[in-house]
Amino acid sequence: MNIKAQIAAHLAGQAEPKRGEMREVHRRVLRASPGCRLWHSDGKDEKGKTVSNPTIGYGLQTIVYADGKAKEFFRIGLSANATGISVYVLGIKDKKLLAKKFGKRIGGASVTGYCIRFRTLKDIDVDVLEEAIRFGFAEGASEPEKNRTAVKKKAKAGGAKRKK
């Protein structure tokens, strides 16, 4: 099954009203970054053990670890959880910035360094959520290509290092 089909099945598998709300957030993420790379994780590790909630991912960033290994990962994530919905805004260097910029304006959501968690869309200002998503894409929009290139060059030269 391709990624779009996996995402459609994942969304269809949610009970209402969460299904409709997840579809609305999905639509807004795609509107914020049309044509972005899509990801889907079923939340299971290689052994089939559940390690996280299933997540839809959007966009691309390259994470470079301290040991020099690099991994491609999504910039924005969408996940249903037992109490509501989580939107992950990854790759922002300042871990206080997301909460500072959107925490008070978004309404009834918990905003941490990289996660916006809410019970229902009725509790939040959805336009501010979309603004936060756009911010997440823009904050490191040029980083994936720069990072990937830097990792390749450093790997050829004997290993990439994590920036401090």
In which residue ranges do the predicted regions lie?
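Charge-dense, helix-prone N-terminal extensions
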Residues: 1-164
